[in-house]
Amino acid sequence: MRRRYSTSIISLVAAAILFAVTPGVPGSSLPAAAAATDSLPALHIDGSRFVDENGRVVLLHGVNSVNKEPPYFAPETTITAQDAELLSRHGFNTVRLGVNFDGLMPTEGVVDTAYLDRVAAAVDMLAQYGIHTVLDNHQDGLSKIWGGNGFPEWAIHARPAAGEPNPGFPLNYLMPTMNAGWDEVWNNTYGALDYLGQALAALADKMNGHPGALGLELLNEPWPGTAFLSCFPNGCTGFDAKYQAAMQKLTDAVRARNAGLMVLWEPNVTWNETMPSNLGKNPPISAPNIVFAPHDYCIPSQMAIYSGLPTFLRGLCPLQQGKTWGNIDAFTHRTGIPSLVTEFGDGDATVLSNTLINADDRFIGWQYWQYGAGRGADPFLGEIGNQLVRTYPQATSGTPGRMIFDPATGDFAYRYTPRATGKPTEIYVSDLHYPNGYQVRVDGGTVTSAPGARVVTVEANGSTPVSVYINRPGSKGASVPDGPVGTGSASGSASGSASGSGGSGSSSGSGS
């Protein structure tokens, strides 16, 4: 019985971290267009939402750009102005940009200022295209010591034992010596957390005066070390308390150098096996401007892709992903802290759709894994891009309500309760879903943008709810689902067409 349990845990662990090898979307070498903006206002947190300087609620859609190999960021390959133009054209307004402790502090106690300069230049470049950057302190497999990346070798004292098998990523997470290395981190045995705090503080300081820097994610996919078995089957209260203390320590280091920068905390990686997070239970999270950064991966689908298991297992994905989103709901209810899904990805468009529908239901932003550094044609012109490039409200002048988007038809519907901000609601209209143009109808408001504009702007007529409908000419359209945000599937029904409505709230055009 004990051996059977151990084998089950090994399978779960392997599945939980397989997502990190999900095939990425290659970058684009398309020429840059004149899409750059003069400045990008910084965002801040209001309750559980991101808001801009005018008080509009901002929804973030974006991608990851993470280079796991030295030099960890190269301006000519990691992400370029051509990439930024392409992402902006497709409506993405955020990038999760990988940074690496080994790159920040390759020598003990010495920060690489040239590395900071390269990162800051990328943040500024992305900001010129209206893209907010989350800096992701990335790791996979703790350190190069075990064939991974993240912590510099000098920061970890544990070493593989003579004759200890290394099965490679991801099963190397089960190596006793790697778990000993993780224990060093969480116990701060040799000061690894202190040095990481210094490195992240230097990065945060560098971001002063760079409004495109949305926030700093303290550590990607934190592994519990030898405590990992305690996380099954209901989460690990003891480890999460220690982990929360470590996150608070790093947050304090960052805030000492940059008080306004958002700080993103991930749950420990067993989250991806539907284990709930105990962050914020005891003690509560008291630091301001904290963002929860969960990931959403489907274990059955990943096992089908990477372990040769039957593809019908993907049919279980709605159950597993439903549990993950239930855990997000529980965390939000407990803490009131906003969430940003900083990783999700799969070669199966249906699995992606599960994430995107759940995110739309809750008005939660996301960053897809991953937009790679390879060159080629526009990578968003296939089935995956058809899901990711979406019509959605980028800035809402009021309180968001329910919304739906059907990538098969381009039908979009959205309702919000207006509030005076001095700026209009802005809805990005997908540049992929309306080959013959689109139609827009607004109930309770007026379209103020030109026909065919890539961003539809809407002004409320009063204080009553505003409903916006966008669809292809001749489509039956969609209707806004009933109920408040987070109460059901964003699937909608075909009864809210923008066609034939006339009036001051209507507009149509070919798009551009």
Model-derived regions: residue spans:
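Secretory targeting and sorting signals
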Residues: 2-32
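Substrate-binding clefts and catalytic carboxylate motifs of secreted carbohydrate-active enzymes
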Residues: 53-57, 197-199, 214, 223-469
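Short, basic/low-complexity N-terminal boundary segments at the transition from targeting/disordered tails
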Residues: 22-30, 35-40, 381-388
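Short linear motifs in intrinsically disordered
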Residues: 35-45, 425-432
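Beta-strand-rich extracellular modules
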Residues: 471-473
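N-terminal-biased segments
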Residues: 37-44, 67-68, 73, 78-81, ...
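Active-site mouth of glycoside hydrolases
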Residues: 38-51, 57-60, 64-262, 267-279
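Composition-driven, intrinsically disordered low-complexity tracts enriched in small residues
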Residues: 28-35, 476-512
